[in-house]
């Protein structure tokens, strides 16, 4: 994990790093030896009142929305620039392929640093959907919680999950009524 982070930070040379209060000191120590250190922002330390001063950023379809890094499992992680157009196109394709029934809710435990997790988060934000998120750790420790959350609602529910996790949930969860689950995206493994 440390080698991956070093490769990513070395490649993108961030000017800002967003973290939380718990991790802020460790993040500052990590960057302390660098001559050009990024600004460290603890998101959970910002006052709620700050939101009222936010103004939308002007941008074009071809502007880079964010960098998505490869896993680095076979070589040094590489940053891929995702444009606003690419993300909106991907969201539209998912919406069309799933034939979403509205109102819809999304349940996920996928980490935001994973491509499925971040695109899912963008997807629900753009469409203004209900979004229930649990941590990957919570899922691994209690996969039955995810099953209970997915099957809890009475509205059309969708989720995304890798193969291994679906198998884990099937082994540990009790019988559940999936009649309101309209779609499960299964992916990220061969």
Regions found by a protein language model. Give the residues of each.
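Short beta-strand->loop structural element characteristic of the AMP-binding/adenylate-forming
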Residues: 1-16, 39-43, 79-81, 130-138
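Adenylate-forming
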Residues: 16-28, 46, 138, 156-190
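Conserved G/P- and acidic residue-centered "switch" motifs that form tight phosphate/ATP-binding loops
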Residues: 73, 128, 188
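Beta-sheet entry/capping signal
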Residues: 15-17, 39, 63, 78-79, ...
């Amino acid at each position: 994990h440390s080698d991956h982070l070093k490769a990513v930070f070395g490649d993108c040379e961030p000017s800002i790093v967003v973290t939380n209060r718990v991790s802020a000191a460790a993040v500052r120590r990590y960057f302390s030896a660098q001559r050009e250190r990024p600004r460290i922002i603890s998101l959970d330390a910002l006052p709620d009142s700050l939101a009222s001063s936010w103004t939308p950023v002007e941008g074009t379809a071809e502007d880079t929305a964010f960098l998505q890094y490869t896993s680095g499992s076979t070589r040094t992680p590489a940053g891929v620039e995702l444009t606003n157009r690419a993300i909106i196109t991907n969201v539209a394709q998912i919406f069309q392929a799933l034939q979403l029934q509205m109102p819809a809710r999304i349940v996920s435990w996928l980490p935001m640093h994973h491509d499925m997790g971040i695109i899912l988060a963008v997807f629900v934000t753009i469409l203004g959907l209900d979004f229930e998120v649990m941590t990957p750790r919570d899922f691994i420790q209690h996969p039955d919680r995810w099953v209970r959350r997915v099957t809890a609602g009475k509205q059309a529910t969708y989720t995304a999950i890798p193969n291994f996790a679906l198998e884990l949930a099937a082994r540990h969860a009790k019988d559940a009524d999936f009649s309101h689950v309209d779609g499960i995206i299964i992916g990220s493994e061969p």
